Amino acid sequence: MSTGKNAPVTENSRQMSLQACLDECMEALDLFLNNHFNESLDKLRPRSKESMYHALIYATVLEMQAMMTFQQDDIVHAGNTMKSAQEVCQRFRKKSGGLGSRGANDDLSEEQIHAEVCYAECLLHRAALTFLQDENMVSFIKGGIKVRNSYLIYKELHAFIQSDATFKGPNHKHLEGGVSFGIGAFNLTLSLFPARILKLLEFAGFSGDKEFGISQLYTGATSHTLRSMLCALLLLCFYTFLSFILGTGEGEVEEAERLLKPFRLRYPRGAIFLFFAGRAEEIKGNIDEAVALFEDGCKAQQVWKQFHHMCYWELMWCFTFKRYWKMAYFYADLLSQESRWSKAMYVYMKAAYLSMLPDSESRPFGDNEVDLFRQVPTYKQKIAGKSPPTEKFAIRKARRYKASNPVRLPVPVLEMMYMWNGFSMISKQPELTEGMMETLLEAERTLRASPDNEYTVDDTCLIQLLKGLCLKNQGQMQAAEDCFNQVYISEKKLKFDHYLVPNALLEMSLLFIDTGRKEQAIKLLQKAKNNYKVYSMESRTQFRVHAALTKLKADVSDQEEITAL
């Protein structure tokens, strides 16, 4: 190699080095998706201090592990590793400012552009870990600042790669994939948030375009680049989880299955894709098929046991939908013993399943529901300084059992099922709704035969709300509307479960949407949004109200909050 060609050789070496890094990281991700988790980390670790892509992907895999284990040591380790990855990326960035400070003729090298997108991604991941790691509001705000900075870099990157002057190096598809992931993630996520929550997160003035976000993520997921997996996982989470839990409950199972198909062919035993395939079957009401896929997901790998916990959670709900209370209890018990995510929730669900059994039926392992309900508050935990809303809800409901002669919760399993929008899940299979209606009618008969007490009105309204959902599933719209209205007119009589009224208004508005009464639906949604505050699971209800208003293309601004929020 002659001295006169040193400059071109150096530039070519840098490009080859970047390409070699990307190729090796793709191989590591391939191992990861084939359940070879430790081998994936072993391939990434040696270069994680010198290659921005090795550093980023290594830290990302550790982050995924930490979010599944929920072990504080794992979260701290992942956070420190992601911080180190950000420092590695910083070394490759342009020294004098970012993209926005470029002069007209001040071109960035391919390596420097890749460093920008990797740096933005590190910020995003660190923000997520910050929210999990610390228990004070200062850390929460720091996480919000990281998110905002990441957002601004992604916006600059998106504009930059769209410009005609952009140099398209040999690894440009990976750069585009990184930008698609960031822009898609922000647009989709921000579109889900009500305006007042965006304000709390320092995102006032920012908004998300849901359809644009989905299109960006879909492009990224189908482009066979380094970020394909992340784009696909985020879309699958949206299609099979977020659209149910924080949306109006339709789900987008056809899109999920279309996205899954090539990944299922490429990774037929990939535990992650078996899990999402199971979730798709669950949404369709094909419970037996879902159970088989979740069980296959558990059998597919034994290295990351914490991945099994995601399957156990879904198996618990599958058996709930079929009213196999003891089988559902079995998975709640496994979770309570093995998972760190929310022991209070798992113990509450164990107690709830036992309470659904006839008094004459034996209890597994000699457990007693009253004792279990009383244990629930002892397992309280905090994330970002606050207890998770579902855990707070479980603890509040379990308080009833502190009394020496407690008044039983009428249908605690079905109530929690509603919080996870499970009644939408069973709507596709009439026999599942019929079974739940039988359970509710039996609970209603028991309640009417019992002496009145301080919980009677609240328990009656809960049963009315859930009956309304079953009747709606069965196409009995007027009867369903009557049930929801019964809850609404009982508002002033409620003593404890004040969440029932805004949720009854939400469900009635969704019924109105289905029956073509758009204007009435909007009025009810605005009432649910503006007239109620400080009730259980408020954020989740507000997310669902926002989703319904967005669906109707109604005004989703806060209207200066002229009524109490």
Curated annotation (Swiss-Prot):
Keywords: Repeat, TPR repeat
Coiled-coil regions listed: none
Signal peptide: none
TPR repeats: 271-304, 461-494, 502-535
A Pfam match: Iml2-TPR_39
Family indicated by similarity: Belongs to the TTC39 family.
Record's protein name: Tetratricopeptide repeat protein 39A
Gene from which this protein is expressed: ttc39a
